[in-house]
Amino acid sequence: MRSSLAPGIWYRAFILLITFLIYTCYHMSRKPISVVKSRLHHNCSEVIQPVNSTHSLNDTTWCNWAPFDKSNYKELLGAVDNAFLVAYAIGMFISGIFGERLPLRYYLTAGMLLSGLFTSLFGLGYFWNIHVLWYFVLVQIFNGLVQTTGWPAVVSCVGNWFGKGKRGLIMGIWNSHTSVGNILGSLLAGVWVDQQWGLSFVVPGVITAIMGIITFFFLIEYPEDVDCSPPQHHGNPEESQDQPEDPANGPSCNKESSLESAVTCSKEASAQPSAISFFGALRIPGVVEFSLCLLFAKLVSYTFLYWLPLYISNVVHFTAKEAGDLSTLFDVGGIIGGILAGLVSDYINGRATTCCVMLILAAPMMFLYNHVGQRGIGISIVMLLICGALVNGPYALITTAVSADLGTHKSLKGNAKALSTVTAIIDGTGSIGAALGPLLAGLISPTGWNNVFYMLIAADVLACLLLCRLVYKEILAWKSSLSKDRGYREM
């Protein structure tokens, strides 16, 4: 006889897997532009011209892709990045509202199909021999808008199945999809970047569209859809100690998890709460602080995402493929940092404190990487891993466990409809920083890469300062808890 625990375990594992793959594809389709940048404009003096070439032997830009063959190529590439990121930031605030009101399966399917289409269209510019800036900018704008369908929807779906207990660790592991997607995007782009860079976009685009079709057929939005009841929402800790759960009560899929519920997903119309308003979500304690913190944290993370391969190529003089491959170590560090941040924050019950400590440590590590990280391949590998962990750890924690915590805050009194909106507000605010970072890097880098790193260090410090009030509250909570423990021991 099959264990009664099996259905719930398998369904939860399946939801984690499919949402992991979904968002891996979203991030995979964003990454190729950072690898292809160094191919769109590079020094052509070492490239042998074709026999029938009409270019001068002194022309060092003949092999570049117009319109990125001019001296202002960094500004143009920054504009292409920003077209995506500004559209993403604007669309994210709207996406959460739609995510609360539309079936997640349809919403994600449409988003992935369109994301695959626009990612491929960027690469098709190579095969169609397109050399006008507006084409690439327009494709990036539409891609940025449709990519916003991903994050609020997958977080909301996972929140329907998992509760607060051990959420930091579970979502820290699950959130590695961001780094895995970046790594896959870099490696796939690197295969074709030196021969036919258009395929660096077309292949990830096709994979993303295929995953969208898989999502349509296999995504399970709610436990009730497979006859499982969701866990109870925000139980009283004291009551749960005095009155342990009766194993004879409730459906089998409630018994296997030690997690508390994130949301209560009743299908009965009378039990369905109304979706929370935008300003109602802003009033949830902690939403504003974490949103502004993520603005600066994501500024740093996305600057690395879009400019690290070009930085490595310029400073170390690697080829586009070598720079793209080496930059994946930053994302490997991000996987480690996300898991570590979730584990530590669960253990100490302090999300803000964990983020603040990692942000403070990231500042001197970035300074060291810029000054000593390029002195040898071994040092570069170690520094990239450390910087990736410290930069992406807080970013991962805020966009997953913190968003889910705030989206199911006790002040909502069980309203499950807040999760997607809160997630969209936090990630949308962060996406403003994601747009600013690459733009500022494009404007500052002509004055020297040192100045870019000073900008990133300043952003990290500001991100930490914005959490000071929440860190103080967590410290007070720890002191209160220690005082109670001492009182019990004395009794």
Curated annotation (Swiss-Prot):
It is a multi-pass membrane protein. One of its GO terms (biological process) is glucose-6-phosphate transport. Coiled coil: none annotated. Pfam families: MFS_1. Residues 229-257 are annotated as: Disordered. It is found in: Endoplasmic reticulum membrane. Inorganic phosphate and glucose-6-phosphate antiporter. May transport cytoplasmic glucose-6-phosphate into the lumen of the endoplasmic reticulum and translocate inorganic phosphate into the opposite direction. Independent of a lumenal glucose-6-phosphatase. May not play a role in homeostatic regulation of blood glucose levels. This is Glucose-6-phosphate exchanger SLC37A2. The gene is SLC37A2.
